Amino acid sequence: MLKLRKVAITGGLSCGKSSVCRILKELGAYAVSADEIVHHLLSSDVNVSQKVVDLLGKSILKNNQIHRSLLAERVFQNYRLLTGLEKILHPAVYGEIEQQYQKQQDSKNQFPFFIAEVPLLYESDGAKFFDTIISVVADPEISLQRFKTHTHKSEKEFQSRMARQISPLEKAIRADYVVLNNGTLSELQQSLRELYQELKIYI
């Protein structure tokens, strides 16, 4: 059986990682999202959720469930708590990604390759788990506008979050492929159709 290529999609804030992941999935790849895995872990994994509550306290609970906005408020201005949270979540996320990958690898392998959207790939030392890295980049002004439109948060919040990440330029330098996402959706789709065909060639 041929090895299923494992691809990570990463990049800066509001650069279009989810759009790239969605388009490649529509073209035929198997896709998972670290953010969706985190949501599942916090809502359904008793072991992980209890560790998070032990770290952050019951103030992050609403109706006895972890509320993500309350969690965010608790950690994003506290480096110690944020680091502690990441130490809980990152191994659990990579464990779930690997489980899903092995399930596809052990099946009839109907997908041409496996992709995982991992925003903090380099920050969490996760590049070693993947065969290929794609970094999505966009001009800072475009990313800022997308961030403000989608989250209704301020430029200050955007800059604060960006400051906690490796720069988009550094992520692009480290990656195997770079996808520029400054234009229209149709332009992005066209560039990804070409990349998709290249990624399928893997032995």
Curated annotation (Swiss-Prot):
Name of the molecule in the record: Dephospho-CoA kinase
Xref: NCBIfam families: dephospho-CoA kinase
Catalytic activity: 3'-dephospho-CoA + ATP = ADP + CoA + H(+)
Compartments, as annotated in UniProt: Cytoplasm
PROSITE patterns referenced in this protein's UniProt entry, alphabetically: DPCK
UniProt-listed Enzyme Commission number(s): 2.7.1.24
Gene Ontology biological process terms from the UniProt entry: coenzyme A biosynthetic process
Annotated Gene Ontology cellular component terms: cytoplasm
Pathways involved: Cofactor biosynthesis; coenzyme A biosynthesis; CoA from (R)-pantothenate: step 5/5
Family: Belongs to the CoaE family.
Tagged with keyword Cytoplasm: yes
Uppermost EC category: transferase
Domain DPCK residue range list: 6-203
Keywords associated with the record: ATP-binding, Coenzyme A biosynthesis, Cytoplasm, Kinase, Nucleotide-binding, Transferase
